[in-house]
C-alpha cells in the first residue's frame, strides 16, 4: 500500500505553529552565516597593500565552519549555506517553509557580515576587494558551474555522512571533517572559481559591492552539486537497518 503523503508536513506548517525552537534555529543560522562571512570572507579581503595567500583563505574558511558547527550544530544543524539546506530539503529531511526561512536568514547574515567588513576596513585599505566571487577568464561559464557543483558535492556528501544516524563507526570530529572538506575545496578550486561552495557567501559581498557579473553561477553550481550529493547519499550510501557494519572502516 502506498503511504499517503502528508502535504502539511512537506510544507512545514507545524515548523511555525508548533515548533518553539524555530526562532533559536533561525537566529543560530543568521549569526553563524554572519561570522562565516566576517571571518572567512575577511581572510580573502585584500587591497593594493597586500594579497592573502591561498592556504590562508582555505584554512580560515575550513576552521571557521568547523568551529561554528561545534558551537551551533546542536541548535540548527549549522547549515550556514543555502546549498546544504536545499540538500536536506530535496531528500525530505527539512520542510519547505523551514528551508525558505533558513535560506533567508543565511542571506541576511551574509549581507550583514560583508557590510561589517566594508565598514570596518574600507578606510584603512585602498582598492578594497570584498572577496566577491568570480571565476577565471580561462574558464567557460559551464566549466565554472561544474567546478562549483563538484566541490560542493564533496562538502554535502561529508555533511550527510557524518550526520547519518545509522552509522556507528564514526570516529574523530564531525565538525572538523566538514571543515576539512571546505578547506580542500578551496585549495583545489580557489584559483579557478574562487571556491564559493556557498551561495550566501557569494551573495553577501555581491550585495554590498553591487557586483553581479555571473553571480548566478554561485547559486546554480553549489545547489546542483548539493542536490546530487544528497540524493546519492540517501538512495545509495545511507546506512539502513540490517546493513553489515563489518565493512566500516577501522584504523
Swiss-Prot record:
Belongs to the MIP/aquaporin (TC 1.A.8) family. The lineage of its organism: Eukaryota, Metazoa, Ecdysozoa, Arthropoda, Hexapoda. It comes from the Eukaryota. The chain crosses the membrane at residues 27-46, 57-77, 100-120, 139-159, 170-190, 212-232. Homotetramer. It is a multi-pass membrane protein. Keywords: Membrane, Repeat, Transmembrane, Transmembrane helix, Transport. CDD domains: MIP. A motif (NPA 1) lies at residues 81-83. Its main location: membrane. This is Aquaporin. Forms a water-specific channel. Residues 47-56, 121-138, 191-211 are extracellular. The keyword Transport applies. Signal peptide: none annotated.
Amino acid at each position: 500500500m502506498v503511504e499517503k503523503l502528508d502535504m502539511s508536513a512537506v510544507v512545514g506548517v507545524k515548523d511555525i505553529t508548533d515548533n518553539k525552537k524555530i526562532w533559536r534555529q533561525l537566529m543560530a543560522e543568521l549569526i553563524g552565516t554572519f561570522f562565516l562571512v566576517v571571518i572567512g570572507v575577511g581572510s580573502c579581503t585584500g587591497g593594493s597593500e597586500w594579497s592573502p595567500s591561498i592556504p590562508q583563505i582555505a584554512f580560515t574558511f575550513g576552521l571557521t565552519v568547523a568551529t561554528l558547527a561545534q558551537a551551533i550544530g546542536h541548535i540548527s544543524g549549522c547549515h550556514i549555506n543555502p546549498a546544504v539546506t536545499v540538500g536536506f530539503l530535496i531528500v525530505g529531511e527539512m520542510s519547505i517553509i523551514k528551508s525558505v526561512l533558513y535560506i533567508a536568514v543565511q542571506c541576511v547574515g551574509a549581507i550583514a557580515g560583508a557590510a561589517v567588513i566594508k565598514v570596518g576596513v574600507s578606510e584603512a585599505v585602498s582598492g578594497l576587494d570584498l572577496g566577491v566571487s568570480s571565476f577565471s577568464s580561462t574558464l567557460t561559464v559551464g566549466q565554472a558551474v561544474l567546478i562549483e557543483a563538484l566541490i560542493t558535492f564533496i562538502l554535502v556528501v561529508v555533511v550527510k555522512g557524518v550526520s547519518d544516524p545509522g552509522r556507528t563507526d564514526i570516529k574523530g570530529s564531525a565538525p572538523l571533517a566538514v571543515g576539512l572538506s571546505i578547506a580542500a575545496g578551496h585549495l583545489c578550486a580557489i584559483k579557478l572559481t574562487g571556491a564559493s561552495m556557498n551561495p550566501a557567501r557569494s551573495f553577501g559581498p555581491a550585495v554590498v559591492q553591487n557586483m553581479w557579473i555571473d553571480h548566478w553561477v554561485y547559486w546554480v553550481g553549489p545547489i546542483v552539486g548539493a542536490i546530487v550529493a544528497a540524493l546519492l547519499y540517501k538512495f545509495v550510501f545511507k546506512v539502513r537497518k540490517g546493513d553489515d557494519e563489518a565493512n566500516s572502516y577501522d584504523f
